[in-house]
């Protein structure tokens, strides 16, 4: 199905969110291209400064033991170190941007009915529980998979525990949880950054 067909099937609110995520993903893609371009320059700078430093050392050792040669060698070594650090920082930024883009792309896929990027919580299915086994609480296309945006095993366990809770809660507890959810709902940048950190963490496991 093409993009127009997808947007027609989505409600007004979903359509707005879908477009927002698409725009954000495109914006981040532009930043990624810029980082890649900078990365190529940093690699070239590292190679050139390293070679110039080696040449300076060779000239000093074999031909001229002059102060200017020593100074040139030190300068190129320092320039190499600076280029290396800038390249490392750029690589870290590139990794973060890729993770952020993955978050946006996962969300657009979710709005299109594709939930595969999110854990389905099958491991929490308990046939002895009052309702978690019979109802679509866990598993593919389940409630857990639809609302799961956790990035740690602890967070996933906590969410599963909330969904399986059978005891009663006080009005204050319910209101506090509702307020926390509403606060996170309006802070899109915080949510995205948090989930991006989780994407990076999973990639390094």
Where are these regions (language model features)?
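Switch/coupling subdomain of P-loop NTPase systems
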Residues: 1-43, 47, 53, 60-63, ...
């Amino acid at each position: 199905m093409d993009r127009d067909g997808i947007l027609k099937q989505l409600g007004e609110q979903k359509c707005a969110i879908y477009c927002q995520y698409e725009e954000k993903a495109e914006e981040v893609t532009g930043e990624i291209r810029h980082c890649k371009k900078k990365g190529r320059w940093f690699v070239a700078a590292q190679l050139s400064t390293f070679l110039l430093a080696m040449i300076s050392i060779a000239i000093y050792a074999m031909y001229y033991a002059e102060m200017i040669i020593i100074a040139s060698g030190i300068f190129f070594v320092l320039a190499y170190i600076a280029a290396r650090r800038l390249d490392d920082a750029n690589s870290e930024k590139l990794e973060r941007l890729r993770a952020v883009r993955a978050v946006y792309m996962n969300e657009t896929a979710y709005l299109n009915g594709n939930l595969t990027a999110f854990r389905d919580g099958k491991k929490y299915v308990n046939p002895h529980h009052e309702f978690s086994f019979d109802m679509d609480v866990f598993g593919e296309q389940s409630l857990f998979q639809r609302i799961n945006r956790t990035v740690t095993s602890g967070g996933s366990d906590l969410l599963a525990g909330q969904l399986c809770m059978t005891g009663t809660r006080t009005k204050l507890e319910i209101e506090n949880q509702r307020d926390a959810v509403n606060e996170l709902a309006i802070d899109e940048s915080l949510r995205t950054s948090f989930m991006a950190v989780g994407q990076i963490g999973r990639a390094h496991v």
